[in-house]
Amino acid sequence: MLLTISGLPGSGTTTVGKLLAEHYSVDIISAGDVFRGLAKERGVTLAEFGRLAESDPSIDVEIDKRQSDIANSSDNLILEGRLAGQMAKKALKIWIKAPLEVRVKRIVDREGSSFDVRMQETVEREASEALRYKEIHSIDIHDLSVYDLVIDSSRWDQFVITDMLKKAIDASGSF
């Protein structure tokens, strides 16, 4: 069974996804890791790479293809990324959300820099991604109607959220 975990930067999707992957002994594929890797390969920041991706649809296509190839080669898999739930056909789809300030603080704690710098980068990145998703895939990233579960990660820590999701996953017979 395929499980998708989506959310905006700093919402906790990667952390929760890794905890679930470990618990269920399944692989996790992260679009963020692919995107960060491609930015690093090109020697640019995430914000710069996001702007580049706005004018170069092949970047999104490459990310989608890498995830799709891996997803199609495994029966049990967690797919983590902002578009994972929008693109997966048969999956248990989860969206993890948190207020912007909470997410930026997490990004600062994880990656360093100042709050103001990370706030600006995050706002720019999210605007860039929303534009790309709309133009390339006709997807409104703010439309959460495709998700089976929406959880606010500012209310609970990653372990409580993981336990909540395990109950939903087990009840659905996903893994």
Curated annotation (Swiss-Prot):
Principal subcellular localisation of the protein: cytoplasm
Binding sites annotated in the UniProt record for ATP: G7, L8, P9, G10, S11, G12, T13, T14, T15
Keyword set, alphabetical order: ATP-binding, Cytoplasm, Kinase, Nucleotide-binding, Transferase
Reaction equations catalysed: CMP + ATP = CDP + ADP; dCMP + ATP = dCDP + ADP
UniProt keyword annotation of Transmembrane present: no
Gene Ontology CC: one annotated term: cytoplasm
Pfam families cross-referenced by the UniProt entry: Cytidylate_kin2
InterPro entries associated with the record: Cyt_kin_arch (IPR011892), Cytidylate_kinase_dom (IPR011994), P-loop_NTPase (IPR027417)
EC number(s) given by UniProt: 2.7.4.25
Domain of life from the UniProt record: Archaea
Keyword Zinc: no
UniProt subcellular location: Cytoplasm
One Gene Ontology term of the molecular function aspect: ATP binding
Annotated CDD domains: CMPK
Gene Ontology annotations of biological process type: pyrimidine nucleotide metabolic process
HAMAP family assigned to the protein according to its UniProt record, in alphabetical order: Cytidyl_kinase_type2
Family to which the UniProt record says this protein belongs: Belongs to the cytidylate kinase family. Type 2 subfamily.
Protein name per Swiss-Prot or TrEMBL: Cytidylate kinase
Organism this protein belongs to: Methanococcoides burtonii (strain DSM 6242 / NBRC 107633 / OCM 468 / ACE-M)
Top-level taxonomy: Archaea, Methanobacteriati, Methanobacteriota, Stenosarchaea group, Methanomicrobia
